[in-house]
UniProtKB/Swiss-Prot annotation:
All copies of domain BPTI/Kunitz inhibitor, residue ranges: 31-81
Organism: Drysdalia coronoides
InterPro entries linked to this entry: Kunitz_BPTI, Kunitz_BPTI_sf, Prtase_inh_Kunz-CS, TFPI/VKTCI-like
Function: Serine protease inhibitor.
Name of protein: Kunitz-type serine protease inhibitor 161
């Protein structure tokens, strides 16, 4: 296969991987944890996956502790947990 064909194949595979939604069986277990602001008193915008609504929602993170269902951006949350 030519290098152009390989490059096209790589591009198509990358596009497929980006557009394929995360299935519930592939979703990490921590995506089902509740939002946890932690014990610190900070005021940081964060996002968590809400399994009942099957979407990512905003919450206020205190800055320490909490759990792994805590993302800095909506996009990161959606890529990791949302179907």
């Amino acid at each position: 296969m030519s290098s152009g064909g390989l490059l096209l194949l790589l591009g198509l595979l990358t596009l497929w991987a980006e557009l394929t939604p995360v299935s519930s069986k592939d979703r990490p277990d921590f995506c089902h944890l509740p939002a946890d602001s932690g014990s610190c008193k900070g005021n940081f915008q964060a996002f968590y996956y809400h399994p009942v609504h099957r979407t990512c929602l905003e919450f206020i993170y205190g800055g320490c502790e909490g759990n792994a269902n805590n993302f800095k951006t909506m996009d990161e949350c959606k890529r990791t947990c949302a179907a």
